[in-house]
Amino acid sequence: MWIGIISLFPEMFRAITDYGVTGRAVKNGLLSIDSWSPRDFTHDRHRTVDDRPYGGGPGMLMMVQPLRDAIHAAKAAAGEGAKVIYLSPQGRKLDQAGVSELATNEKLILVCGRYEGIDERVIQTEIDEEWSIGDYVLSGGELPAMTLIDSVARFIPGVLGHEASATEDSFADGLLDCPHYTRPEVLEGMEVPPVLLSGNHAEIRRWRLKQSLGRTWLRRPELLENLALTEEQAKLLAEFKTEHAQQQHRHDGTGDA
């Protein structure tokens, strides 16, 4: 996968290219990231990249000409088929389904805004889609772009150490992930669930699915509203709810004689 970045601070993306899963993907040639700064497309000695908005008001906007020229340079480098995305709080909210959708693109160009944003006409003429990572305001589009890159890169074949990792992540099937455990077997009196030590893969799968359903019900119940549960899932969720109620009953001490 190739990703082009339009940013006034391209050096921020070293966090993506030099470290972790994405850094390994770049090193192994599975992910390629190039960047263009609008400052390199200015024509004045101050390398000005911002301008006042028409109609007044606080703040500045990114200048049209340097931004458009940077986008055009990225498009030229990408060739045909690159989708141009503007990271914006007004865009479609990124979720796992959206990540999976974006991962089907071989080429992406991510435009990172600064100041109060960019000229609406640039959005109309240069941008294919707007995406947001949440209902809050950041100082620029770089962190959302890095979030998008990291999440999308996990779907590139060969990037993750275990091929099933991306499909088993939280939200991959619309549910939160189940709890995970590693050594030691007992930590300050807390034991690993015995089923995980049993070697019974069918029971382990069933336990993990039950915990995934239950954790989603407890923490993000709205996610279940959009899911058509299978007969097995509905049964496991009912079991979890019963077990949870019993645990709460014992915890509250109301079960004492």
UniProtKB/Swiss-Prot annotation:
Under the heading Gene3D superfamilies, the entry gives: 3.40.1280.10, tRNA(m1g37)methyltransferase, domain 2
The record's EC number reads 2.1.1.228
Keywords linked to the UniProt accession: Cytoplasm, Methyltransferase, S-adenosyl-L-methionine, Transferase, tRNA processing
Which chain regions cross the lipid bilayer?
none
GO cellular component annotations of the record: cytosol
Q: Which residues form a coiled coil?
A: none
Origin, by domain of life? Bacteria
Q: Which terms does the record give in the GO molecular function aspect?
A: tRNA (guanine(37)-N1)-methyltransferase activity
Location within or outside the cell: Cytoplasm
Summarize where S-adenosyl-L-methionine binds, as residue positions.
Answer: G113, I133, G134, D135, Y136, V137, L138
Location, primary (coarse class): cytoplasm
Provide the GO biological process annotations: tRNA N1-guanine methylation
Reaction equation(s) it catalyzes: guanosine(37) in tRNA + S-adenosyl-L-methionine = N(1)-methylguanosine(37) in tRNA + S-adenosyl-L-homocysteine + H(+)
- Report quaternary structure and partners: Homodimer.
Summary of the function given for this chain in its UniProt record: Specifically methylates guanosine-37 in various tRNAs.
Q: Which family does it belong to?
A: Belongs to the RNA methyltransferase TrmD family.
* Protein name, entry field: tRNA (guanine-N(1)-)-methyltransferase
